[in-house]
Amino acid sequence: AGIYLGKDYDFTYLEDPIKAIEWLNEGNVPDLIISDIRMPLMMGDEFLRYMKNNELFKSIPIVMLSSEESTTERIRLLEEGAEDYILKPFNPLELKIRIKKIID
């Protein structure tokens, strides 16, 4: 997602959710998090639950990316607090529009 957003937004890429949590615990507060569903060390739904159950981070909007077109999964993640669910591959312009709607 970073290659599509770099010109319009400051973007920090972190390799896995554990590094993201460490980065957040260092005091970094992003306007938005984009997270894949399938990641090393911790799945995206676990990361989402961790974030939404943490008082410091629960207000940060999270957009989930997935290559699986599963209505059940999409509804579950939205119910668990995801701001949006975007199917991969995605149109870069659509991603920018959705992000703009969330953070503006």
Where are these regions (language model features)?
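Two-component/phosphorelay signaling modules centered on CheY-like receiver
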Residues: 1-12
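C-terminal output helix
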Residues: 90-99
